[in-house]
Regions:
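Short solvent-exposed loop/turn micro-motifs enriched in small/polar/acidic residues
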Residues: 50, 62-63
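C-terminal binding/interaction regions
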Residues: 2-49, 54-56, 78, 96, ...
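Short small-residue beta-strand/loop micro-motif enriched in glycine and branched aliphatics
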Residues: 76-81, 91
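Active-site cofactor/substrate anionic-group-binding motifs, chiefly glycine-
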Residues: 84-85, 100, 106
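Short beta-strand elements
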Residues: 64-75
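Short, thiol/selenol-centered motifs that function as redox-active sites or metal-ligating centers
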Residues: 62, 84-93, 131
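Short, small-residue alpha-helix embedded
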Residues: 91-101
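Short Gly/Pro-enriched turn/cap motifs at secondary-structure boundaries
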Residues: 57-61
């Protein structure tokens, strides 16, 4: 697993460093093309300094940690972004969470499930299904924070 041979992107090197310790290789068939795409080119990644609300969630078992940022207009999520510390599945799940939530009402976004995220990614390995929980939990925490700071 020499990193010198595998330099298609910085993201790939990060994966090799983070998941290699767990004996995982993204390109061995463990992940489908959609998961790889959302890992290599995450949608809506980054902070949002002028966010209306933010919510976080961490998984103490694996160490993954996600923060989601929301901009809301008339109860609709107009902008959403994220920062995540985690494996490829956590990054891909976080990215897909933002794709699914953007443009939805708060109520619709709150109803997004772990299964919906995993299905939208085309599936996750059984031992990585918990990664979709990060998105659901952080999104619900962000929505709760928004409602507290913007009472109806």
């Amino acid at each position: 697993m020499a990193r010198e041979r595998l330099k298609p992107s910085v993201a790939h090197d990060i994966l090799r460093l983070s998941d290699a310790e767990k004996g995982e290789n993204m390109f061995d068939g463990t992940y489908n093309d959609t998961v790889i795409d959302h890992f290599m080119s995450p949608r809506n990644a980054g902070t949002m300094p002028d966010a209306d609300a933010e919510g976080s969630f961490g998984d103490s078992d694996c160490g993954d940690y996600l923060t989601l940022y929301l901009k809301v207009t008339n109860s609709v999520i107009r902008e959403i972004s994220f920062l995540v510390f985690g494996c490829a599945a956590a990054i891909a799940s976080s990215s897909m969470t933002t794709v699914l939530a953007k443009g939805r009402t708060l109520e619709e976004a709150e109803a997004i499930t772990e299964k919906e995220i995993a299905d939208a990614l085309g599936g996750l390995p059984e031992h990585k299904l918990h990664c979709s929980m990060l998105g659901v939990s952080a999104l619900r925490n962000a929505i709760e924070a928004y409602r507290k700071s913007h009472p109806a």
